[in-house]
Regions:
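N-terminal alpha-helical interaction blocks
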Residues: 1-147, 153-161, 165-166, 173-181, ...
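Charged, low-complexity interaction segments
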Residues: 1-61, 185, 189-198, 204-608, ...
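Residue-level signal for mature regions of secreted extracellular proteins and peptides
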Residues: 116-119, 142, 162, 196-199, ...
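Subunit-assembly interface segments of extracellular/virion macromolecular structures
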Residues: 121, 166-168, 174-176, 184, ...
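Short cysteine-rich clusters marking metal-coordination/redox-active sites
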Residues: 123-126, 146-153, 168-169, 203-206, ...
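Short, non-ligating residues that shape and space the ligands of small metal-coordination modules
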Residues: 132-133, 176-177, 212-213, 233-237, ...
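Short cysteine/histidine-rich zinc-coordinating motifs and their immediately flanking basic loops
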Residues: 135-145, 167, 180-184, 216-221, ...
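Elongated scaffolding segments in large macromolecular assemblies
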Residues: 187, 649, 658-752
Length: 752
């Protein structure tokens, strides 16, 4: 018999990538008809650039590898954790996690299949439990349910309700509620651990095979089955088949390695509960070119060192003209040297010419400086005297977590700078790709302002930016973002789960990929991708204020020459921190979830500062734009002291952020957004004392939905902005001075 082809449904792309992702239980409108989504082969390939696909595949590999490493630690368990308990078998090769690029297919979610699930029912009149073995036989079995009626088969109400409670396990399995349960039967006289799985489907007292499902009000703990014949009670109990196969032999007492029954037992949960399905995915900025991101390849470490050295002001090796000419000729760029020499000769002549204008001199000097800068970043890369910390960072970064990689952030910022921030590019209708909020374009100015009022408004904007310690703030249009989902877990969204019966032991949560779909001549796991192009705000903090803030709070920064920017020193500090188990940035930031356990380091503190400032802007923008908190995303560029906050969404960008900025402008206070951010009350918390004790970040103030946050709400603290406390992980235990406090001191000191 050919397999049943499931029906399909259409939902929005964002819903199909999350709430209706493959293997997600759902009910139709009105709560009737419980079903489960299944992978569908009819979705079209996502129109992504090859570099974007490769980056997504690398992120998935990194995510799964880190997940497995954390899940297999087995803290508090009495046996080693098998890798198959942490990730899908399809990800495992040679005893390691390997997500092959060829096993993935990148698709745009447009349609999804679904099947009825669970196939377990209860009589609305008497509570008799019935179930179907499979979809193929469900119709026939359902028609015979009334034959099992314990009262009057002829007068049976034949009115059945689908049970909306399922049995779930952190292995990723979901099963219908059933009176049958599995157990491990040890072989008598066989070798240690020998045995098999057996199922008990009948009453232990009378061997009856019909049961009532009793559902008293209250928690699921009160639910139970009752034998129709003898009324013997049977608890709701099931053991996960996959885990029982693996750990069943370890259930016997007296063994050196032993499993707990609680590791194997499934749990009853509501079909609609979030614990039934946690979708896993990520997002990344989409760029047009990979000139700078291409330097991140392992084969280009020397060029990457040269880029960082040039970008952050490390001194260059002095090359003679003959050496520079030779290198450029070898690279096929000799004509550039000829042009450079010609411009240099002209400059020398003009400098000795009476009446030469400063504008002419500056133009010639700028041409020479630009040529030298370009050469230092490309053909002369690797000849800079980069500090050992920079070389270590470029060499060791292959072991770092991608989203916390300061070197990658530097390359991404350089790309963003060239493609979006500077250069005066337009997107059509005269709109520029990015606009400095100190110098607004016609599309961001409030209507009806006189030139005098406009000048006053921009003056007030500048004043508030100074009070916030912001050196540059821009509205950026057409921020390219790709969001994707690739897998799921049950019962818990993190790599481990704890239960009271195990007294703190951490059990592994299995990360599963979306089920395979047909692709040409084979099958592959779908990665559901959604590309977006929306507005955002780019913010860069003042380097001098950040440096003073670190110094006054006793946070050491690696020593460097006077011309070396703070960003280079932060990269060095981050590289050093990655070698310290107490302060490294692991995938799930376990180090920073422990109270008072991490020393003060510049990398962690600046990351927390930028992250907190980004959340502060998100909460204010959400309140003033009408967008909910989950409609925002964030990206940090720590070495450049910058962050990007943008609108997430697959619907057409209606210019919510630009409209908000335009409508909130006023000559008296510049702009409501900045005025609100400056106002101390915007960072007060309704749970002030409790929040401060927990590090200064809670749902009442800074936390946003985890799906929108870069770190799932770690490395946040109001104290980095306003003082009056310190982050929960800081082991110094003395309150810090807030960044806004120092910025305000400087702004007031410089006020006319």
């Amino acid at each position: 018999m050919s397999p049943i082809k499931p029906p399909t449904m259409v939902r929005s792309r964002s819903q199909l990538g999350s709430a209706y992702a493959p293997h997600h239980p759902f009910t139709f409108e009105g709560g009737e008809g419980a079903c489960m989504t299944v992978p569908w082969s009819g979705n079209r390939d996502a129109a992504l650039k090859e570099i974007t696909k490769r980056t997504i595949a690398e992120q998935i590999q990194e995510y799964c590898e880190a997940w497995a490493a954390r899940a297999t630690q087995g803290t508090g368990l009495r046996h080693p954790v098998d890798l198959t308990q942490a990730v899908d078998q399809s990800m495992i090769s040679g005893g390691a996690v390997r997500v092959r690029y060829g096993d993935l297919v990148f698709q745009t979610p447009e349609i999804v299949g679904y099947v009825p699930f669970p196939l377990a029912f209860v009589c609305k009149r008497c509570g008799l439990h019935r179930s179907c073995d499979s979809l193929k036989t469900a119709e026939k079995e359902f028609a015979n349910f009334h034959a099992a009626c314990p009262n009057d088969r002829q007068g049976c109400a034949n009115d059945w309700q689908q049970i909306d409670v399922v049995m779930a396990h952190w292995s990723g399995d979901l099963e219908p509620l059933t009176p049958s349960y599995r157990h491990w039967h040890a072989s008598q006289g066989g070798p240690p651990g020998a045995g098999e799985i057996r199922t008990i489907s009948t009453c232990m007292s009378c061997s009856g095979d019909r049961f009532y499902l009793k559902r008293p009000p209250g928690s699921f703990a009160g639910w139970h089955f009752e034998c129709v014949s003898c009324h013997t009670v049977r608890p709701i109990l099931q053991r996960d088949r996959r885990t029982l196969e693996l750990l069943g032999p370890l259930l016997q007492a007296g063994q050196t390695t032993q499993a707990f029954p609680a590791e194997i037992n499934m749990e009853p949960i509501s079909y609609r509960a979030s614990a039934a399905h946690y979708t896993h995915g990520d997002q990344l900025l989409v760029f047009d070119e990979d000139r700078w991101l291409g330097l991140l390849a392992e084969s280009r470490i020397q060029e990457l060192c040269g880029f960082l050295a040039t970008q952050y002001g490390y001194p260059t090796t002095q090359l003679s003209d003959a050496e520079r000419e030779r290198i450029l000729r070898e690279q096929g760029r000799h004509q550039e040297w000829v042009n450079y020499k010609g411009s240099r000769d002209v400059l020398r002549m003009v400098e000795n010419t009476p009446g030469a204008t400063q504008q002419m001199l500056d133009g010639l000097r700028g041409t020479l400086q630009q040529a030298e800068k370009d050469w230092n970043e490309t053909v002369f890369a690797g000849r800079q005297q980069a500090a050992p910390g920079i070389l270590e960072a470029c060499t060791a970064r292959s072991r770092w977590i991608r989203r916390y990689d300061f070197v990658r952030m530097a390359a991404e910022h350089k790309t963003l700078e060239e493609e979006k921030l500077h250069g005066g590019r337009e997107i059509g209708d005269g709109k520029k790709v990015s606009v400095d909020v100190r110098v607004l374009d016609p599309f961001l100015k409030p209507d009806g302002l006189s030139p005098a009022d406009e000048a006053r408004m921009l003056e007030q904007v500048s004043r508030r930016l100074d009070l916030l310690g912001i050196a540059e703030m821009r509205l950026v249009r057409n921020v390219g973002v790709c969001e994707y989902t690739f897998g799921y877990t049950r019962t818990e969204s993190k790599p481990t789960v704890q239960r009271d019966k195990l007294q703190g032991a951490e059990m592994p949560v299995k990360l599963r990929l979306h089920g395979r779909v047909k692709v040409r001549d084979g099958a592959a796991h779908p990665v559901l991708c959604i590309e977006q192009s929306n507005e955002g705000f780019y913010v860069r903090l003042d380097e001098a204020i950040v440096l003073e803030w670190l110094t006054r709070n006793g946070v050491a920064v690696p020593a460097a020459g006077p011309d070396v920017a703070l960003g280079g020193r932060l990269i060095e500090d981050f590289a050093d921190a990655q070698n310290d188990n107490a302060s490294r940035f692991s995938r799930f930031l376990d180090e920073y979830r422990r109270d008072r356990s991490v020393p003060r380091r510049a990398a962690a503190y600046v990351f927390t500062l930028l992250h907190t400032a980004a959340h502060h802007l998100i909460t204010v923008a959400s309140a003033m734009s009408g967008l909910d908190l989950s409609s925002f995303g964030e990206h940090l560029f720590v070495p450049d002291l910058a962050f990007l906050v943008y609108r997430r969404g697959t619907t057409m960008d209606l210019g919510n952020l630009s409209s908000m900025w335009r409508e909130r402008g006023h000559p008296s206070f510049g702009n409501d957004v900045l005025d609100r951010m400056v106002n101390p009350s915007s960072l007060r918390c309704g749970s002030e004392s409790v929040c401060n004790q927990r590090g200064g970040a809670c749902p009442d103030c800074l936390l946003i939905p985890e799906s929108a946050c870069l770190t799932r709400n770690e490395l946040l603290s109001r104290s980095v902005l306003i003082g009056r406390g310190l982050p929960r992980w800081d082991d110094v235990r003395t309150s810090i001075i807030g960044y806004f406090e120092i910025a305000a001191e400087r702004a007031l000191a410089n006020a006319p």
